[in-house]
């Protein structure tokens, strides 16, 4: 009986050590990441959108959508603008009022990951659930590459938004001008 308890205890400790090690490696990888560029697929309800983005920490993002409206999304770290280039309409948000404020804040992500227990999903991803005020964000990292591979949030209309990112490139030379907010006409 004591042998069984000892074996269970050792297996449990081994599993916890593996999770802790993976978590530490994810944190280290995030600390070394200054920017990332990627393609994405975003699902909001039945609607699927695709495109590409550049994130520069802290809190800057530029995304170009491959859709009929040729939508772009830009944050300069304070504001977030979504522009429909076909009809020239603009949507302006304070970044701090959106879940992207947290996702684009590398320091916040690292601080939260240090406090949280992650879980393995489909033996491929490591997931952390961040809760901040009214925002619940699931972030996913690839177990092999340790890279951020997506997130799940709710939009302002309480629709589930799932963003999967791929073809990820880290620490590329980027044009800082892409984070300038488009001028409203």
Where are these regions (language model features)?
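Short hydrophobic/aromatic-rich beta-strand segments that constitute the beta-sheet cores
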Residues: 40, 61-65, 80-83, 128, ...
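Sec-dependent N-terminal signal peptides
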Residues: 5-14
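A short, Trp-centered hydrophobic/proline-enriched beta-strand micro-motif
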Residues: 28-48
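An acidic-aromatic
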Residues: 53-102, 161
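Flexible, surface-exposed loop/linker segments and immediately adjacent secondary-structure boundaries
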Residues: 86-125
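Gly/Pro-enriched, hydrophobic low-complexity segments
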Residues: 111-185
